[in-house]
């Protein structure tokens, strides 16, 4: 037994652990505890980063929804404004067409009135000439009556023309 190398190896192993076991145990457990603390710290950091990432994702989703709502509101306002502008342009075009139509009708009425006045003036001139011819031919037999009627007719002619023109 004392000459067996296995005995001495086992005794050296046991003595080594009895003498240095506590120090080795403290060093190994200290290293393992430090490693566990490091892993725990890394896990806490990862959890914190995950919470931050989730918060950032929620913020980004909220911002995206807010931006989408604003965009839709802007689009609706733009469509309403475009419809209003189109309606206003349509009304302006209708008003312009109505103004042009009224101006054309006014011109037509003015031309009609002018033509009627010209016809009335010409008819009055023809009537006066015809009356003069008739009166002069019929009253040649009696010169006094003819002169009196012609003078009265000529004197009343401007007033009669004014009445017919009005």
From Swiss-Prot:
How would you describe this protein's topology in the membrane? Answer: Single-pass membrane protein
**Which keywords describe this protein according to UniProt?**
ATP synthesis, Cell inner membrane, Cell membrane, CF(0), Hydrogen ion transport, Ion transport, Membrane, Transmembrane, Transmembrane helix, Transport
Q: Please give the CDD domains that the UniProt record associates with this protein.
A: ATP-synt_Fo_b (cd06503)
Per the record, the major location class is membrane
| Similarity comment text for this entry | Belongs to the ATPase B chain family.
HAMAP family, A to Z: ATP_synth_b_bprime
Q: What does this protein do?
A: F(1)F(0) ATP synthase produces ATP from ADP in the presence of a proton or sodium gradient. F-type ATPases consist of two structural domains, F(1) containing the extramembraneous catalytic core and F(0) containing the membrane proton channel, linked together by a central stalk and a peripheral stalk. During catalysis, ATP synthesis in the catalytic domain of F(1) is coupled via a rotary mechanism of the central stalk subunits to proton translocation.
Assembly and oligomerization:
F-type ATPases have 2 components, F(1) - the catalytic core - and F(0) - the membrane proton channel. F(1) has five subunits: alpha(3), beta(3), gamma(1), delta(1), epsilon(1). F(0) has three main subunits: a(1), b(2) and c(10-14). The alpha and beta chains form an alternating ring which encloses part of the gamma chain. F(1) is attached to F(0) by a central stalk formed by the gamma and epsilon chains, while a peripheral stalk is formed by the delta and b chains.
UniProt protein name: ATP synthase subunit b 1
